[in-house]
Amino acid sequence: MGKIYNDILETIGGTPLVRLNRLDKDLPGNVLVKLEFFNPANSVKDRIGKAIVDAAEASGELKPGGTIVEATSGNTGIALALVGAARGYNVVLTMPETMSLERRVLLRAYGAEIVLTPGSAGMQGAVDKANEIVTERGNAILARQFANAANPEVHRKTTGEEIWADTDGNVDIFVAGIGTGGTVTGAGETLKKHNPDVKVYAVEPEASLRDRKSVV
């Protein structure tokens, strides 16, 4: 009999590596991509959504029937909503009113409560509102994806180790987009632990407020 998972969260991680044959046919090496959209909510953020909740449960900060709060307009919100639905937590997500209707519909489908903030206040307005909600509600935690140590740690333990194992340690360069920095930092540190000569590159939009060539 094949493996039967106890819940949807057990399917997070273990995503495949696929060779880009057309892209690398004229290159001296192989270009591989890790298909994080194979995660149940279709993004790499599923890893940190579960990891953040796991850590909060383990520390006793998040108790049964509690509420998870975060300011997010992206995939982290979807991941937290998924985990909340699977574990029985309330999820409250704050975001500027300028965010797409499609994103709001998806989040509500997972059972999340959406609190919209003035678009003129940007993401800072959403962050301020999230802090306010956590203060007002009992048994509530702030996910803090940008500052939560569980974010890079889950990539050290899973993403980086998966890449190393699936390539039999044949990794020269690791490239990742940078949002919170958790993926490139955590996975990059693991790869460099196995082989200090691995080069790690973080990629972000040119217009980003951050300007850095390396984080590892």
List the model feature ranges, each with a label.
Residues 1-216:
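PLP-dependent amino-acid enzyme catalytic core
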